[in-house]
Amino acid sequence: MRLACTFVFAFTLALLCGGTGHSLRVPIAPLTMEFHSGNLHLKAFFWKPNGPGPFPAVLFNHGSGGPDAAHTAGIPITQAAERLAPVFVKHGYAFFFPFRRGQGLSADQAPFLQDVLQREEAERGKEAREHLKFVLMTTEQLDDVVAALAFLRTLPEIDSHRVAVTGHSFGGQLTLLAAERDADLRAAVTFAAAAESWERSPELRERLLTAVHKATAPILFIQAANDYSTAVSRDLASELERLQKPCLKRIYPPVGKSAEDGHNVIYTDIPLWEDDVFKFLNEGLTR
């Protein structure tokens, strides 16, 4: 797929799909699965359309900025998964939502990331916190994503050659790193990746620029205009355009009243991004 980078200003549980040209009844309850990341036993939610498959699959990387291990983007993390899954399944995609170490159903496998970072800031200051966040993102947190992708491809219901990765906020950063690591991914979609960190962390900027340089999958950057900052989407998309690599950028009008509202557009205004995301995924996973 060849897309020029463009700039555009541009839940109800659905039971029948319309995006694939045929009806697929959406299962309400997920399957809970377990996979290994090193010595850890991590959990994941899994949904798929009815039928034997194999289906194209989307792995979703949740954020890590909630007040505790059970929340993301201001809502329970399990509810976040349940809010998104029907949208992907109705378009014909299996949806895999791994809980990384220390969070959600994997909270018993490690300390919650924010607790670790807050302790680091209290002992050594904000710069030390940012550096530790970067280190953990590029090591153990990324390890969990890579392990989840490997596990997902072993499932008999999945077409292992048609897998995409998506993510929100911190999970959006991991999505870019996964796209760099895994040359077999067919598409990557980030929602509000690095919106709070891009301008204050030179090492993060350098690392994500390197990631998009090396990634082979088409990348879609999504943000609302009132996110904390949209510089990351603008800068990364501009770099991909310079390199003549396939990408797309969507910066939508403001959502809600605050930067946090804009940051969490993935959960608060699904109809705003749904058409763009599935057009992009459909093109990427059928090329």
Where do the model's predicted regions map?
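Alpha/beta-hydrolase
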Residues: N61, P98-R100, F191, Y252
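Alpha/beta-hydrolase active-site loop
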Residues: Q109, L113-P156
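The conserved beta1-alpha1 loop
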Residues: P56, N61-G63, Q223-A224
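Short substrate-entry loop that stabilizes the transition state in hydrolases
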Residues: G53-F55, S64-A107, S197-W198, S229-T230
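Primarily recognizes the serine-hydrolase "nucleophile elbow" in alpha/beta-hydrolase
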Residues: M137-K214
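C-terminal catalytic histidine-bearing segment of alpha/beta-hydrolase fold enzymes
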Residues: P246-R287
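N-terminal cap/lid segment of alpha/beta-hydrolase-fold proteins
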Residues: G21-G53
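The feature captures the conserved acid-bearing segment of alpha/beta-hydrolase catalytic domains
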Residues: A187, A193-L248
